[in-house]
UniProtKB/Swiss-Prot annotation:
Location (main, coarse): membrane
Keywords, sorted A to Z: Membrane, Transmembrane, Transmembrane helix
Subcellular localization, as worded in the UniProt entry: Membrane
Cellular component aspect of the GO annotation: efflux pump complex
Source species of the chain: Haemophilus influenzae (strain ATCC 51907 / DSM 11121 / KW20 / Rd)
Record-stated family: Belongs to the membrane fusion protein (MFP) (TC 8.A.1) family.
Protein name in the entry: Uncharacterized protein HI_0894
Pfam families: HlyD_D23 (PF16576)
Membrane topology summary: Single-pass membrane protein
Length: 382
C-alpha cells in the first residue's frame, strides 16, 4: 500500500514538474519571437478653420397669409377668383347675395331727398320765426339719422364681399355659386409669397450669439440635396415664459424663397464666427470607454526598440500606440472639433484599426484612404 502511494506521489510531482518546465520553455520561445504589429490608418493633424453652428428646426411662412372667411351668412352669388390666381389688394374674390340690402339702400336714399328738403325749408322758416328751433333740430336729426342709415347699409353690402387683403396668390376656392354659407365659413386662402420667411426658436443661452443679418442655411425633406439661404431679420425682444426660448425669424433670399411653400418643416443651421487654428479630426478617430472619449496617437519607437527590430522591413512604418483622453467641443458631418491640449497640431492620430490595439501596442501605419474621413459626394435620405 505504501509503495502504491509513493508511486502516485512521484507521478504527481513528475507531471507538475513537466508542466513547469514546459511553461518555461514556451515563455522563452515566445520571448525570442519578434513582437507582432497591428495595422492601423492614421493622419497628421493640421490646423483648420472651424465654423460653429447652431442646429434647430423651423416652419416656413409667407410674408403675409390669411384664410379668408365670411362675416355674414347668406348665399354665394358670385365667385370671381380662380384657383391659384394672382390677386391684387382690394380685388373682390367672392360676393354673397345682397339684393335685400341693396333694396333697403335705394329706399333709404329716396327718403333722404325728402328729409334734406324738409331740413333746408325749416332752416329758412326759422329765420322768420315760422317754426321753432326744436322743430328745426328734429328735422336735422331725422336727416342725419338717415345719412347714417345709408352708410350702414353701404357697409353691410361691402361686408358681403370677400376681398383680397393684400397682393398675393389665391389657393383653392372652397365654396360654389349658390351655396349657403354661415358666418366664419372658410372661402379661400391668400398668401403673399414675395418674401418667404422661417420662424424658429432658440435657447436663451444662445441669444448673445445672434444678430440681425446673420446667415442661416435651411434644408427640407421635400427638396433633398438642396440648401436655401436666409438671414435673420427679427429677434423677439422678450423670452417666451412658457418655453424659456426666444422666437427668431429669418427671411430667405428671393431666389431661394420661391422654391418653398408655407408650412414646410425645415432644418436650420445658424453660422457663428469662424474659429482659426483649430484641432479637427475625423470622428472615426474617437473611441469610447467607460471613462469617456479616447483616441490613439502614433508614438515613434525608442532607439533601443529600433535596434532590436533593425532587420524588420516594416521598421519605418512601426510605432507605439499611445492612448489619450480627448474632449469633443463640436461635431459637424464626419469631423469633430477637439478642445484641450491632448492632441496638438502635428500629432499623428489613429483613424482605423483601434479595435485590436491598446495603450503601448506595436502598430504599423498603413498609408491609404481613410474610411469615414471624407464627406459623401451625395447625401441620401438615410
Amino acid at each position: 500500500m505504501k509503495i502504491i502511494l509513493v508511486v502516485f506521489v512521484l507521478i504527481f510531482v513528475g507531471v507538475i514538474g513537466f508542466n513547469m518546465i514546459k511553461g518555461v520553455m514556451i515563455s522563452r520561445a515566445i520571448a525570442g519571437m519578434p513582437e507582432s504589429s497591428s495595422p492601423v490608418t492614421a493622419l497628421e493633424v493640421q490646423p483648420r478653420e472651424w465654423t460653429p453652428v447652431i442646429n434647430t428646426t423651423g416652419l416656413v411662412r409667407p410674408n403675409q397669409g390669411a384664410m379668408l372667411s365670411t362675416q355674414n351668412a347668406g348665399a354665394v352669388s358670385q365667385v370671381l377668383v380662380q384657383n391659384g390666381q394672382n390677386v391684387k389688394k382690394g380685388e373682390v374674390l367672392v360676393e354673397l347675395d345682397s339684393s335685400v340690402e341693396r333694396a333697403n339702400l335705394q329706399a333709404a336714399q329716396a327718403q333722404l331727398s325728402a328729409l334734406r328738403q324738409t331740413y333746408q325749408r325749416y332752416v329758412g322758416l326759422l329765420n322768420s320765426n315760422a317754426v321753432s328751433r326744436q322743430e328745426m333740430d328734429n328735422a336735422k336729426a331725422a336727416y342725419d339719422a338717415q345719412v347714417a342709415s345709408i352708410e350702414s347699409l353701404k357697409a353691410a353690402i361691402e361686408r358681403r364681399k370677400i376681398v383680397a387683403p393684400f397682393d398675393g396668390k389665391a389657393g383653392i376656392v372652397k365654396i360654389n355659386v349658390g351655396q349657403y354659407v354661415n358666418v366664419g365659413t372658410e372661402i379661400v386662402r391668400v398668401e403673399d409669397t414675395s418674401s418667404m420667411k422661417v420662424d424658429f426658436a432658440l435657447s436663451q443661452n444662445d441669444l448673445d450669439k445672434l444678430h440681425i443679418g446673420q446667415r442661416v442655411t435651411a434644408t427640407t425633406d421635400a427638396r433633398l440635396g438642396e440648401t436655401f439661404s436666409a438671414r435673420i431679420t427679427a429677434i423677439e425682444p422678450a423670452i417666451n415664459s412658457s418655453t424659456g426660448l426666444v422666437d427668431v425669424q429669418a427671411t430667405f433670399d428671393p431666389e431661394d424663397g420661391h422654391k418653398l411653400l408655407s408650412g414646410m418643416f425645415s432644418r436650420l443651421r445658424i453660422a457663428l464666427p469662424t474659429e482659426t487654428n483649430q484641432v479637427v479630426v475625423p470622428q472615426v478617430a474617437i473611441s469610447y470607454n467607460m471613462y469617456g472619449e479616447i483616441a490613439y496617437l502614433l508614438e515613434p519607437l525608442s532607439e533601443e526598440e529600433k535596434g532590436k527590430m533593425s532587420g524588420n522591413e516594416k521598421l519605418d512604418r512601426l510605432y507605439r500606440a499611445k492612448q489619450i483622453t480627448v474632449f469633443t467641443k463640436d461635431r459637424q458631418g464626419v469631423y469633430a472639433q477637439l478642445q484641450g491640449n491632448e492632441v496638438k497640431v502635428g500629432d499623428k492620430i489613429i483613424t482605423g484599426g483601434q479595435q485590436g490595439i491598446g495603450n503601448g501596442s506595436l502598430v504599423e501605419w498603413i498609408k491609404k484612404d481613410i474610411v469615414g474621413a471624407i464627406e459623401p459626394a451625395h447625401k441620401t435620405p438615410l
